[in-house]
Amino acid sequence: MPRLLVAASGTGGHLFPALSVADALLEPWSVRWVGVPDRLETSLVPGRYPLTTVKAGGLQGRGLRKLIQLIQLLAASGSIRRLIQRERIDAVFTTGGYIAAPAILAARWCGIPVVLHESNAIPGRVTRLLGRFCTRVAVGLEAAAPRIQGCRAVVTGTPVRAAFLQQQSLPTWVPQGSGPLLVVIGGSQGALGLNRMTRELFPSLLSSGCRIVHLTGSNDPDVGCIEHPLLVERPFSDEIPALLQHADLAISRAGAGSLSELAVSGTPTVLVPFPQAADRHQDANAVCAAAVAAAVIVHQHDPSETTLRDTVWRLLGSKLPGGDPGANPLPEMGQAMRELGVEDADQKLVTLLEGLLN
């Protein structure tokens, strides 16, 4: 019975792809999980897979702080090494987060295969530093492969939750009407800037019959400042697969997880990269979609500027009163977005893992 240790921690962008791969593994595979205390995995993983938590952190500091972080890294690697030996783990799969570095080092220490999945177009710090110690580095976007040095990169795509691959019904709480549906996904990171940009569009769109669902993220002080029967604001939603499948247009950040979900849903999108993202990786992710005409990039700007408004009206105009139905770019954008997606990314990663043990 092959035993896999999944090392994934922190955000949904790390956890959901790892969960998709773990769920795709069939008997006789046995899966265990290692994560970090007080992170998202402590609520998502238990009940599905046995979870062990190990204290781990980043390596962003200097001087004494960095020395302490290095000591924590070695201690975490030792803890994971003991877990690997105790549970007789055969391979490690990691999607990043604070737990990735000690898991890679522990796997190397134990002499077992380790696969790292990098979902962004610009490899993250762990991939750049430790990718050479991995048996394989799987990448979600083809643009990342040439940027990975010292190891063999394999393009697999980024796995998404199963709900994105199944046809979903539009939630009943979505505004009803004949106008187009715009879905705005603020996200939990850097949502305020995007939210303020998009709210400047709402009055004119709503008065033209456009239906809007705005997922604001938490702690948005401006929620409720616009009230209209065609507008619904929510902090989050578990029904994003249905929203994206039925949306005529989305406005979203350009995180790798979000881009993968938009792609398999075939949703035409205006991408607004988070300007403070590490290494500006969201800009690079957005370029991958824009290069195939699946998305339009609008950089975050002051709400008083008109770039986002002009872009959205150009894309949705054919579906609004007075627009030219023959000048509708959305179908071609949706098709290009769907071609960017990889629906069987989880199976590609399963095949990769199985091949390393056979």
From Swiss-Prot:
A GO CC term attached to the entry: plasma membrane
Nuclease listed as a keyword: no
**Residues where UDP-N-acetyl-alpha-D-glucosamine binds:** T11, G12, G13, N120, R161, S188, Q282
Q: Does the keyword section mention Cell inner membrane?
A: yes
SUPFAM superfamilies membership: UDP-Glycosyltransferase/glycogen phosphorylase (SSF53756)
Q: Name one GO biological process term.
A: lipid glycosylation
Q: What does this protein do?
A: Cell wall formation. Catalyzes the transfer of a GlcNAc subunit on undecaprenyl-pyrophosphoryl-MurNAc-pentapeptide (lipid intermediate I) to form undecaprenyl-pyrophosphoryl-MurNAc-(pentapeptide)GlcNAc (lipid intermediate II).
For this chain, the family text in UniProt reads:
Belongs to the glycosyltransferase 28 family. MurG subfamily.
HAMAP family per record: MurG
Q: Which named protein is this?
A: UDP-N-acetylglucosamine--N-acetylmuramyl-(pentapeptide) pyrophosphoryl-undecaprenol N-acetylglucosamine transferase
What gene is it encoded by?
A: murG
